[in-house]
Amino acid sequence: MSRVAKKPIDLGKVELNVQSDSVTAKGPKGTLSLAKPAGIAINVDNGVATLSTENADLVALTGTVRAILSNMVKGVSEGFERKLELVGVGYRAAMQGKDLSLSLGFSHPVVFVAPEGITLSTPTQTEILVQGADKQVVGEVAAKIRAFRKPEPYKGKGVKYSDEVIIRKEAKKA
């Protein structure tokens, strides 16, 4: 079995419910579920979950399922967040109820409606915080917001992740 799949998952305060075709993780931040592939066994005892398989073809998939399960457990207990920064003159973000209104240099404000399970907030006018229990959805929402105005390489203007480094280019010499 793969090294990732062998590592046990510490559940903590999360309740893991394993059926024949699905796995459900329930915690303080919500509930997430996963369709369990056939041939992979998930055992839960004493607050620790372990995965195993008899089929040699499913070894790689077992490691993938273990990583997804681990992210589900972390998501329903602590949650995930992604921070975005707006760089540029006049670039601003503001909340209008549950919707995010972005001024990104277009002739109109861009309004983004957050999907269910995602919380958007703006600590400052140039910062956006995306929070939620599902790691994949949090990353997807952050990528959609970033796609409205990707950072350009000459001045670095646009929407970027807080930990992203923009590689700069030099302007053409006349």
Swiss-Prot record:
NCBIfam families from the UniProt entry: L6_bact
HAMAP family, per database record: Ribosomal_uL6_B
InterPro entries: Ribosomal_uL6-like, Ribosomal_uL6-like_a/b-dom_sf, Ribosomal_uL6_a/b-dom, Ribosomal_uL6_bac-type, Ribosomal_uL6_CS
Phylogenetic placement of the source organism: Bacteria, Pseudomonadati, Pseudomonadota, Gammaproteobacteria, Lysobacterales
Native source organism of the sequence: Stenotrophomonas maltophilia (strain K279a)
Keywords carried by this UniProt record: Ribonucleoprotein, Ribosomal protein, RNA-binding, rRNA-binding
Pfam family, one: Ribosomal_L6
Function: This protein binds to the 23S rRNA, and is important in its secondary structure. It is located near the subunit interface in the base of the L7/L12 stalk, and near the tRNA binding site of the peptidyltransferase center.
GO CC annotations on file: cytosolic large ribosomal subunit
Family: Belongs to the universal ribosomal protein uL6 family.
Keyword rRNA-binding: yes
Protein name: Large ribosomal subunit protein uL6
Quaternary context: Part of the 50S ribosomal subunit.
Any GO MF annotation of the entry: rRNA binding
Biological processes, Gene Ontology terms: cytoplasmic translation
Keyword Cell membrane: no
